[in-house]
């Protein structure tokens, strides 16, 4: 089954870490990505730019309006995602639990990806 692992964290938290902690964090990410590539579970993933660079499009008075900034103000940001193909939701959650942002006050949301027909998996 395919899952989207949504990475949530606090903007700028890595700048609060020491250089050694930051290096270790990025090293863990590299290790997880390498492992998932080797096992064939990794479909893809990307980090997202800072929320200050976000544009939000909303319908206002029947017309689309482009606004600067994220959809809602929050202490956490949607920071990126991983798409994985693994045997179970438990395995997807195991992968998410290893993501280092979780230890620093972030969260990983595990969501099944719908199939091409638009039905729940």
Residue ranges and their predicted role:
Residues 1-121:
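Conserved, structured core segments of small domains
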